[in-house]
Amino acid sequence: ANMNAVIFQVRQGGTAYYESSYEPWGYYAGYQNPGYDPLAAAIEEAHSRGLELHAWFNVFQTSSTHDGSPAAEHPEWICRDQNGIPMSSYRSLSPGLEDVREYTINVAMEIVRNYDIDGLHLDYVRWNEHTNSQRNNPTVDQELERLDGMINKNEIEYLISNMSGRYLYDYQHPYSAGVPDGFISWEEWWRWSVTTFVKTLH
C-alpha cells in the first residue's frame, strides 16, 4: 500500500510503551506491564513485513503525573510563568534545565541502545505554551516593520497573542531574574536550550 515505515509511539507524557528503567508504563498500557514489550513486538512485526520501525518520542511534554513519571518525581522541572507558578495542565519540562536535558537524553538513548529501531522521531522538542499574558511584547507595528510586510497584521497579532500565553521560565531561570547570563534576550536562550539538547542527543 505504498508504505515503507511505521511510526510507533514509545514515550507519551513522561511514560513508556517499552521496558523502561526510567519511566512508568503509559496510560494505554494501564500504567502496568502488559505482559509483553510493545515496542519489541512492534519492531518484530514491522521488520517481518519489510517495514522500518521509527520510534515516536515525546521530548519535553510531560502531562502524566503518575508515580515514577518525571513530573511526579521532579515537579521542580516543570516550566513556570512570569510569577514562578508551574504549569498545572499540558505540562512541559523546561529545556533550559541541564538536569532535564540530561535525563531526557538518557531516556532516548535507552531506546536507541536496547531496540533495533530504524529512526527516532522527536516530538514536542520545543518550549511549550499556555497561560501567561503578562510578558511584554513588541507592538504589531514594530513586528510589521521588522518583517517588512511579509505577513499581514492579523497573523502578527495572532503570533504575539500566542507568545504571550506561554510558560517560558523555570525555577533556575525565573522571569524576575532577567535574561540568563551570557544571552542577549530570552529568545536567544530559549533557542539555545533546545538546540543544545538536540546537538547533545545527536
Region annotations inferred by a language model:
Residues 54-115:
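Active-site-adjacent "subsite" loops/lids of carbohydrate-active enzymes
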Residues 9-14, 57-61, 123-128:
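Short, solvent-exposed turn/loop segments enriched in Gly/Ser/Thr/Pro and often Arg
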Residues 12-58, 181-202:
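Aromatic-lined substrate-binding rim segments of carbohydrate-active enzymes
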Residues 5-7, 50-54, 90, 118-121:
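Structural preference for beta-strand elements that scaffold enzyme active sites
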Residues 1-15, 114-119:
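Catalytic domains of carbohydrate-active enzymes, especially glycoside hydrolases
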Residues 18-30, 61-87, 125-178:
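Aromatic- and acidic-residue-enriched segments that line the glycan-binding/catalytic groove
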Residues 112-129:
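Extended hydrophobic secondary-structure segments
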Residues 116-121, 177, 184, 188:
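Solenoidal tandem-repeat scaffolds enriched in leucines and small polar residues
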